[in-house]
Amino acid sequence: EERPLAVLLDGEFWAQSMPVWPVLTSLTHRQQLPPAVYVLIDAIDTTHRAHELPCNADFWLAVQQELLPLVKAIAPFSDRADRTVVAGQSFGGLSALYAGLHWPERFGCVLSQSGSYWWPHRGGQQEGVLLEKLKAGEVSAEGLRIVLEAGIREPMIMRANQALYAQLHPIKESIFWRQVDGGHDALCWRGGLMQGLIDLWQPLFHDRS
């Protein structure tokens, strides 16, 4: 089965608080998105979210080894990394890039919105751990396709994202960098989420020949 896969973090928000199904259905019918399998992962609560999302290998191993096989038995999807998007906001954006950097053979497309790349140094006076690992060459973004989005009204987040984008400059042809006129705002995120999926999956329409 070649249907692409999208893993959306904070899934209960996108399923219930700001449902994405109507717009995903519309974009698919209009052939702006390919027919795909969407997996929305519930954060449970703020305590679990703060523990599981920021750079947590155990979380992503559980997703790959336990959750995705169950999903695949119900709704088959492609194993190809270039057909797989992991998307998140805030801690979820950080987590999405972490997944792509550590398991590029599974998660080849990253959609990060307002990613918390300052983590774990909330004051913003020190570089976040993921940026440090990239600078040290401990991880590489080579081969990934990345949507990186941040709002001009979230200064600490914006600074951290700008620093990350500068570090990723050698692969800039594979990055969609967006500064949006907004803050830590779900209304901004929904539009960016849809556009990010369109951009990351656009090559699939050219593969159909």
Protein language model features and the residues they cover:
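Non-catalytic cap/lid and distal C-terminal segments of serine-dependent acyl enzymes
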Residues: 1-209
